[in-house]
Amino acid sequence: LLLMLLFVAEVTSANTVDFDKAFKESARIEKQIKRTSFPKRTFLITDFGAKTDDEANPCHEAINQAILQCSLSGGGTVIVPKGTFYTGPITLKSNVNFHLEEGAVLKFSTDQSLYFPAVLTRWEGIDCYNAHPLIYAYGESNIAITGKGIIDGQGSMETWWPMCGAVKYGWKEGMVAQR
């Protein structure tokens, strides 16, 4: 019994968090964070061809073009106006404030083919090539997502759960499985 109690005590102490060290690390990280700043230029996604309420034609190409042009011009704000915009993956670029006006809704497509080819991303803390996240940036800086609009990933048992690779959630042979 004594041996077992010593073992439990040792295991418990091995799992103890050093809060002082953790807080010092968080303070170091906070010092590296810089406030974003954007030029006054604006880019309206509808000027690049994005249309509302058109589920059959997701407008991610128009949105990504607006973001790219904004970044290439030195930065500014890409505006998603009021309305429902169906979209695929969005890639943010440096010096872009992606702003959703009040009443704006971005509904991401559940068509998994839109999220390929794979991009370098992280899955459970591991760098890997995987499906393009709904909103993505790699190697970019000075980015913000602002506004009172809604970002709707349309996650449901029917749409995203089959990707876990379990038959009980609807996965079938040939489908993408993230496990």
Predicted features, each with a name:
Residues L5-I79, T84-N97, E101-R179:
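Extracellular "leader-to-stem" segments immediately downstream of a signal peptide or signal-anchor
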